[in-house]
């Protein structure tokens, strides 16, 4: 057992021009979760994002979608975590993952940023603490490192987008276990699905 998740952060870029792009897979996850639970996200400028509180497995969980650009996500995460006294190891950051194919989602505890600017900024904002959980939503890789920036900022074709949504749905089913602190069960369910 590990510390239970009490804050879920969905990474993305603000603005309609970035809506439903591959890079916003984390943001889409949190927005869909809030919508499914009937809890609208509210613009909360003091925390640099849209926030709400949900109940999962009888526990309060804070949701956050930063209104900062991806590379400044740490400002929002640190603000909300500090305000509610949420330790880094109680945070789950949901983000796009180039190294996983569309249709795949993986959980991970701690580690580096892997070149992801949102994770890099969160690690720095949390005092170089890397022990937060990550839900990695696969978006695939364009095959050429020089194409990554344009690739992640584009919308996925419809068939690929459906695969990303399927992975998000599978990941959502693990949240009750994560809130209970049962990362092993959540990983087993998600990684063998």
Curated annotation (Swiss-Prot):
Transmembrane segments: none annotated. Disulfide bonds: none annotated. Its EC number is 3.1.1.29. One of its GO terms (biological process) is protein quality control for misfolded or incompletely synthesized proteins. It is found in: Cytoplasm. TRNA binds at residues 18, 69, 71, 117. InterPro entries: Pept_tRNA_hydro (IPR001328), Pept_tRNA_hydro_CS (IPR018171), Pept_tRNA_hydro_sf (IPR036416). The keyword tRNA-binding applies. It comes from the Bacteria. Keywords: Cytoplasm, Hydrolase, RNA-binding, tRNA-binding. One of its GO terms (molecular function) is tRNA binding. The record marks 96 as: Stabilizes the basic form of H active site to accept a proton. The active site is at residue 23. It catalyses: an N-acyl-L-alpha-aminoacyl-tRNA + H2O = an N-acyl-L-amino acid + a tRNA + H(+). Pfam families: Pept_tRNA_hydro. The record marks 13 as: Discriminates between blocked and unblocked aminoacyl-tRNA. Belongs to the PTH family. PANTHER family: PEPTIDYL-TRNA HYDROLASE (PTHR17224:SF1). NCBIfam families: pth. Hydrolyzes ribosome-free peptidyl-tRNAs (with 1 or more amino acids incorporated), which drop off the ribosome during protein synthesis, or as a result of ribosome stalling. Catalyzes the release of premature peptidyl moieties from peptidyl-tRNA molecules trapped in stalled 50S ribosomal subunits, and thus maintains levels of free tRNAs and 50S ribosomes. Monomer. This is Peptidyl-tRNA hydrolase. It comes from Teredinibacter turnerae (strain ATCC 39867 / T7901). The lineage of its organism: Bacteria, Pseudomonadati, Pseudomonadota, Gammaproteobacteria, Cellvibrionales. The gene is pth.
């Amino acid at each position: 057992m590990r510390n239970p998740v009490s804050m879920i952060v969905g990474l993305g870029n603000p603005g309609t021009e970035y809506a439903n792009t591959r890079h916003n897979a984390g943001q889409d996850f949190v927005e869909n979760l809030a919508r499914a639970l009937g809890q609208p996200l509210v613009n909360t400028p003091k925390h640099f994002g849209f926030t709400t509180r949900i109940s999962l497995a009888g526990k309060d969980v804070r949701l956050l979608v930063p209104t900062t650009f991806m590379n400044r996500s740490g400002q929002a995460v640190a603000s909300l975590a500090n305000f509610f006294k949420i330790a880094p190891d109680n945070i789950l950051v949901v983000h796009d993952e180039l190294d996983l194919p569309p249709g795949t989602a993986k959980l991970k505890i701690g580690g580096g940023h892997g070149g992801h600017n949102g994770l890099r900024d969160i690690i720095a904002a949390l005092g170089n603490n890397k022990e937060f959980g990550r839900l990695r939503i696969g978006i695939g890789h364009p095959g050429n490192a020089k194409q990554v920036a344009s690739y992640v900022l584009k919308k996925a074709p419809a068939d690929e987008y459906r695969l990303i949504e399927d992975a998000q749905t599978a990941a959502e089913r693990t949240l009750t276990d994560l809130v209970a602190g049962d990362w092993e069960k959540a990983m087993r369910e998600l990684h063998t699905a």
